[in-house]
Regions:
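Active-site-proximal beta-strand elements of phosphoester/diester hydrolases
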Residues: 22-26, 125-127, 172
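N-terminal short beta-loop-beta anion/metal-coordinating cradle
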Residues: 1-44
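Proline-aspartate-enriched helix->loop->beta-strand connector
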Residues: 45-50
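A C-terminal functional module that forms or caps the active site or interfaces directly
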Residues: 132-178
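Alpha-helix C-terminal capping segments
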Residues: 39-43, 61-62, 160-168
Length: 211
């Protein structure tokens, strides 16, 4: 395994399931996530980007511990309405949201069912913004405007960077809370559990990816 340090991040390059991989923790927020993704593409020539993490549920049917696999992602805090753009639309971009790779999404859903059969898996839009959503008003806004299933702080930036570079991507989120400030278990406990599930899930996806 080789470790590369750049932009205050550590990139671990090696082999998993017979595939060359680079594992990195981007840090919190959209800027960190976008920088991390661009480094993966520029320096490590990533052919696929898979991001795992946690998110808050925006759907009454999606409970803590469930998994949301992205169909597409959007910036819920992007607002250029004054210039004639709809909420969420990035000015001068041809995409309103960034669509995940269909093949990766199908692999992930199947892998979730096989690796964690007791965990519910949902496919839907994930909304990202540079804020931790614990306010009902913000939650209602994101649901009404975008119909998102989950909300977090990095996914859309990763998706945008990958989209601009024509690199297939997927975002997978374990639900840690209801995006209303509530939680059924303490965060460190959930984080450890989610990390273990994400690792097993990623291994299975890697095993099934062709090439």
């Amino acid at each position: 395994m080789e470790i590369t340090r750049k932009a205050s991040m550590e990139f671990y390059a090696g082999v998993l399931e017979g595939k060359k991989v680079v594992v990195v923790r981007s840090g919190i927020g959209k800027v960190n996530a976008a920088i991390c993704t661009q480094i993966l593409i520029d320096d490590f020539h990533a052919e696929v980007v898979i991001n795992t993490g946690i998110a808050g549920s925006l759907n009454a049917d999606i409970n803590i511990g469930d998994i949301v696999v992205s169909t597409d992602l959007i910036h819920h805090d992007m607002n250029a309405v004054a210039f004639g753009y709809p909420v969420g639309q990035i000015p001068q971009m041809d995409a309103f949201s960034f669509h995940s790779d269909d093949a990766l999404r199908k692999l992930a859903v199947q892998a979730c069912k096989e690796v964690n059969p007791d965990i519910e898996v949902f496919e839907g839009r994930i909304a990202s913004g540079d804020q931790f959503v614990a306010d009902q008003g913000v939650q209602d806004f994101v649901v009404k405007e975008f119909g998102a299933y989950a909300v977090e702080m990095e996914g859309a930036a990763i998706a945008q960077a990958a989209y601009l570079n024509n690199v297939p991507f997927l975002v997978i989120r374990a639900i840690s809370d209801k995006a209303d400030g509530s939680a059924e278990m303490d965060y460190p406990t959930f984080e450890a559990m989610a990390a273990e599930h994400s690792f097993k899930l990623t291994l299975r996806i890697l095993k099934d990816i062709q090439g």
